[in-house]
């Protein structure tokens, strides 16, 4: 540690409180050994060679660190650790912190603090966890209730849809009745028109016959003619009246037939719309069925969760039984200890306190067992009620499913009946145009023939395509084989090339050896020539200097003879070398011949292999050519087939065109006949009009006008009624669409909520596992400590007081470390609870806001205030969109500021405190280790 950690307390009065705590005065952290105050000083520190020092008696029996001093230092009660007492109110200012409130553990430590406080805190924590678990179970129950309400609302919506379907069925029945009435009226009107046409034809025939009779009579008897003329005029007037009435009836019938045909068309359109609506309702019902199945799956999941809770409750029962067994064991141990204490009267106050603590612990465990038993009974009752509710819901769902199935069957039956009625009506309307139907049948037959031909063409095409594909595959296989053979051929060529290359290299090496030998021979020949030149030069010199150098000549002759001998030797050597070269060349030639023979054999083998491969390739090529020929033949056959099919198609198309021309000609002839009849009818009507213009009265016209006006009013009323029904259907459609959207949104929200709940459950299970592991570790540690206590009590020696002080100091250190750890866990737990509460609150806000936007009524158990539905409060939890950062205006709350010295100083201070805490933690661990080793050494056991 440096000097920064030795700051006095007075210099930090005006500084703010941080989560790490306030700085305290540093304890003595010198690395020198702690000398016991009772140790006798050594007089012979410098004399190492002298004998061992005489043992002297200590002033006190205790040779350890004073246990009361151990816990009076700052490391045990530092302000950085969370305080145990929660009832002290926080100070408003950090500078005026009361010193008595900084350390609230010292007073408890000076008193006789019971040894089982960590276990108590652990039990309190378990109780809190159980409470939280119970709260979450209630929340899950509420969510289940909401799911059930949503399911009930879906079922009610389904019932509404079923009622709408019933009303639509009733309307369809009424429309069917109206349709049948209109069809019957139409048939009666057609019969009346046919009767009237027959009457007209009979009257025309009578007129023609009477005209012939009048023309054939003689003009002699004028009186008879006049009478006959009068009679004829009367008959004509009667006939004209009849014609007029018939004409009016025909016009009325035509108008009625047009109106009824329009009504029929409109009602057919309405029927189609109703059928579409029925299909939509069926699809909606299927969607609702899927939703119901999804909710059934959710209910099954909930039942599985309930079963898991049952299993957990059984596990808790087992744990309770284990705790009961532990409590019995502790009671037995207590009784044994009490008997021992009664035997050994001299017992310390500390052990009595321990006994009291054990008794208190046993009482608390028994209370916990009783509370847990009551909780288990209550939970079992709740589970039974939930299971009963689940069975009721499942029975209701099954009933609703059966009802829906029966209603769907009824709808299907009605739909089939409607379709049958529509088919019958269409068949009745189609039966009037027999010629057109016959022609259409012919066209259909031709189309069927065309279709059959196309089918056969497509089948033959598919067969040929398959054959072509198979042959293509064979060609590909053969091509692959060709490629493999070519690769083998290329490999063989490569090997041949490599061998040729090696042969060339060997030849080049032999040529190099030849050149080196020739160079040696040439060098020897040059030396010989040089010697000969020298001899010639010497001979020339001797001729010039015979007289002066006779002695030299003799010497030179001797030298020449020596040189001759050397030359002979060199020539002999050259000959020997030539012989060797010849022998070597013979050997090399033999080797070469052998190599050449081997290579020739290899080349012959390779050529044979190549020939075989070429034969295979040629055979493969022939097979490929054959397949290609077959392929071309098939292609030509296919082209011929296609040509034939095209010709057939053209013939059929020509036939179709001819049949269409026949149809057109028939229709034209029918139109011409109809126009001729119309012309005749118009001529007759014009004649009748001319005859009856004088006799027509205004009253008849007024009556006709009034009748037509009434009919128009009735048609307008029917039109308005139809428009109103159309608007009703549109409204109902919009309602169905909105309900579908709402259900889809609710489904998405429920999925999101279920995912969030699963995440929270996973977190809770992790926290629970951690707490359970900590509890088990603490229980094991407590058991080990109790075993050690029992062992230490059995071994009572002269140094029992010293050992007891060591044990007390060790357990006090252990206790305070556990207190600090528990306080840290409390802080973490509070933080996690706050985070969970905020998360759940946020989820509730989102769900409430969604329900508010969908206009869904709130349930009765709404625990949130109305302030949380405010948009301002809702935006509080979202990221704020900060404005632009201007250089001039930096005083706003959302603009960047410069870092103040205060924040930096607080950060540095927190780092220093964390360093100090880490140092104190290490020193405490060292103390614990030293004390544990001392206790084990004193008890006679050494753990290596």
Curated annotation (Swiss-Prot):
InterPro entries: Spc110_C (IPR040593)
Annotated phenotype, changing residue 91 to A: Leads to a mild increase in the proportion of preanaphase spindles at the expense of elongated spindles
Main location: nucleus
The family this protein is said to belong to: Belongs to the SPC110 family.
Alphabetized PANTHER family for the sequence: NUCLEOPROTEIN TPR, NUCLEOPROTEIN TPR-RELATED
Top-level division of the source organism's lineage: Eukaryota
Subunit structure: Homodimer. Component of the SPC110 complex containing at least CMD1, SPC29 and SCP110. Interacts with SPC97 and SPC98.
Signal peptide residues on this chain, from the entry's feature table: none
Alphabetical GO biological process terms: gamma-tubulin complex localization to nuclear side of mitotic spindle pole body; karyogamy involved in conjugation with cellular fusion; mitotic spindle elongation; positive regulation of microtubule nucleation; protein localization to mitotic spindle pole body; protein-containing complex assembly; regulation of microtubule nucleation
Compositionally biased intervals (Basic and acidic residues): 96-110
Motif Nuclear localization signal location, chain numbering: 54-59, 726-731, 742-747
Region (Disordered): 23-110
Gene name of the record: SPC110
Subcellular localization: Nucleus; Cytoplasm, Cytoskeleton, Microtubule organizing center, Spindle pole body
Modified residues (Phosphoserine): 60, 80, 529
Miscellaneous field: Present with 279 molecules/cell in log phase SD medium.
Protein name: Spindle pole body component 110
Keyword hit for Aminoacyl-tRNA synthetase: no
Residues where Phosphothreonine is found: 18, 64, 68
Biological role stated in the UniProt entry: Component of the spindle pole body (SPB) required for the proper execution of spindle pole body (SPB) duplication. Potential role in cross-linking filaments or anchoring other molecules. It is essential for growth.
Calmodulin-binding: annotated span: 900-927
């Amino acid at each position: 540690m440096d000097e920064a950690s030795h700051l006095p307390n007075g210099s930090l009065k005006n500084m703010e409180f941080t989560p790490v705590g306030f700085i305290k005065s540093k304890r003595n952290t010198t690395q020198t050994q702690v000398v016991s105050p009772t140790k006798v000083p050594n007089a012979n520190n410098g004399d190492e060679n002298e004998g061992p020092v005489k043992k002297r008696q200590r002033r006190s029996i205790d040779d350890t660190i004073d246990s009361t001093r151990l816990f009076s230092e700052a490391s045990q009660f530092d302000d950085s650790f969370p305080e145990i007492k929660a009832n002290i109110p926080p100070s408003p200012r950090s500078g005026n912190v009361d010193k008595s409130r900084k350390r609230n553990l010292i007073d408890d430590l000076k008193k006789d603090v019971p040894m089982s406080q960590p276990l108590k805190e652990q039990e309190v924590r378990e109780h809190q966890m159980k409470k939280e678990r119970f709260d979450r179970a209630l929340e899950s129950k509420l969510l289940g209730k909401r799911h059930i309400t949503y399911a009930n609302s879906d079922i009610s919506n389904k019932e509404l849809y079923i009622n709408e379907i019933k009303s639509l069925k009733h309307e369809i029945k009424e429309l069917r009745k109206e349709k049948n009435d209109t069809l019957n009226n139409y048939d009666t009107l057609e019969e009346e028109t046919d009767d009237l046409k027959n009457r007209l034809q009979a009257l025309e025939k009578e007129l023609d016959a009477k005209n012939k009779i009048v023309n054939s009579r003689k003009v002699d008897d004028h009186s008879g003619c006049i009478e006959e003329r009068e009679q004829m005029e009367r008959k004509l007037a009667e006939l004209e009246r009849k014609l007029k009435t018939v004409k009016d009836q025909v016009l009325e019938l035509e108008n009625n037939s047009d109106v009824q045909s329009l009504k029929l068309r409109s009602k057919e359109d309405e029927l189609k719309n109703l059928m579409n609506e029925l299909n939509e309702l069926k699809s909606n019902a299927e969607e609702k069925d899927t939703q119901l199945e999804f909710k059934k799956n959710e209910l099954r999941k909930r039942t599985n969760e309930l079963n898991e809770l049952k299993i957990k409750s059984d596990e808790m029962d087992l744990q309770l039984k284990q705790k009961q067994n532990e409590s019995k064991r502790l009671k037995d141990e207590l009784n044994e200890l009490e008997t021992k204490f009664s035997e050994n009267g001299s017992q310390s106050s500390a052990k009595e306190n321990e006994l009291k603590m054990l008794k208190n612990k046993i009482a608390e465990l028994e209370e916990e067992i009783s509370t847990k038993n009551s909780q288990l009974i209550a939970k079992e009752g709740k589970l039974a009620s939930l299971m009963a509710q689940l069975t009721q819901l499942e029975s209701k769902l099954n009933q609703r499913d059966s009802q829906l199935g029966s209603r769907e069957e009824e709808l299907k039956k009605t739909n089939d009946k409607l379709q049958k009625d529509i088919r019958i009506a269409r068949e009745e309307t189609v039966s009037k145009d027999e010629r057109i139907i016959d022609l259409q049948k012919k066209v259909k037959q031709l189309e069927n023939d065309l279709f059959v031909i196309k089918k056969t063409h497509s089948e033959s095409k598919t067969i040929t395509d398959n054959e072509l594909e198979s042959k293509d595959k064979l060609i590909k296989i053969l091509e692959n084989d060709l490629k493999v053979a070519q690769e083998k051929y290329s490999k063989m060529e490569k090997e041949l090339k490599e061998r040729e290359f090696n042969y060339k290299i060997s030849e080049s090496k032999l040529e190099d050896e030849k050149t080196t030998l020739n160079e040696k021979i040439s060098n020897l020949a040059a030396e010989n020539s040089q010697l000969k030149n020298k001899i010639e030069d010497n001979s020339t010199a001797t001729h010039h200097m015979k007289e002066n150098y006779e002695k030299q000549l003799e010497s030179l002759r001797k030298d020449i003879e020596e040189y001759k001998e050397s030359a002979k030797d060199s020539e002999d050597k050259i000959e020997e070398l030539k012989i060797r070269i010849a022998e070597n060349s013979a050997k090399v030639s033999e080797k070469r011949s052998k190599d050449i023979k081997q290579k020739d054999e290899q080349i012959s083998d390779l050529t044979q292999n190549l020939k075989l491969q070429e034969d295979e390739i040629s055979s493969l090529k022939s097979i490929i050519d054959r397949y290609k020929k077959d392929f071309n033949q098939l292609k030509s056959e296919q082209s011929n087939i296609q040509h034939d099919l095209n010709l057939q198609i053209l013939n059929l198309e020509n036939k179709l065109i001819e049949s269409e021309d026949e149809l057109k000609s028939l229709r034209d002839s029918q139109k011409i006949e109809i126009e001729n009849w119309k012309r005749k009818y118009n001529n007759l009507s014009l004649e009748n009009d001319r005859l009856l213009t004088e006799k027509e009265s205004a009253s008849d016209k007024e009556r006709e006008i009034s009748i037509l006006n009434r009919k128009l009013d009735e048609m307008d009323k029917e039109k308005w009624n139809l428009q109103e029904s159309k608007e009703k259907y549109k409204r109902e459609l919009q309602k169905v669409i909105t309900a579908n959207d709402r259900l889809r949104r609710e489904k998405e929200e429920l999925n999101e909520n279920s995912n969030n709940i699963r995440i929270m459950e996973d977190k809770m299970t992790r926290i629970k596992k951690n707490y359970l592991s900590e509890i088990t570790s603490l229980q094991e540690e407590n058991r080990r400590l109790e075993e050690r206590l029992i062992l230490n009590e059995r071994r009572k020696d002269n140094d029992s007081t010293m050992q007891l002080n060591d044990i007390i100091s060790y357990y006090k250190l252990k206790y305070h470390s556990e207190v600090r750890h528990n306080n840290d866990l409390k802080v973490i737990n509070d933080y996690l609870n706050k985070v969970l509460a905020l998360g759940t609150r946020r989820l509730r806000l989102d769900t409430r806001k969604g329900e508010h936007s969908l206009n869904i009524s709130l349930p009765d158990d709404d625990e949130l205030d109305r302030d949380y539905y405010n948009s301002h409060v809702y935006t509080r939890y979202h990221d704020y969109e900060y404005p632009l950062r201007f250089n001039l205006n930096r005083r706003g709350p959302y603009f960047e500021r410069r870092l103040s010295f205060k924040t930096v100083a607080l950060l540095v201070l927190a780092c220093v405190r964390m360093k100090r805490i880490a140092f104190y933690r290490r020193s405490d661990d060292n103390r614990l280790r030293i004390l544990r080793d001392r206790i084990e050494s004193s008890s006679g056991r050494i753990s290596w």
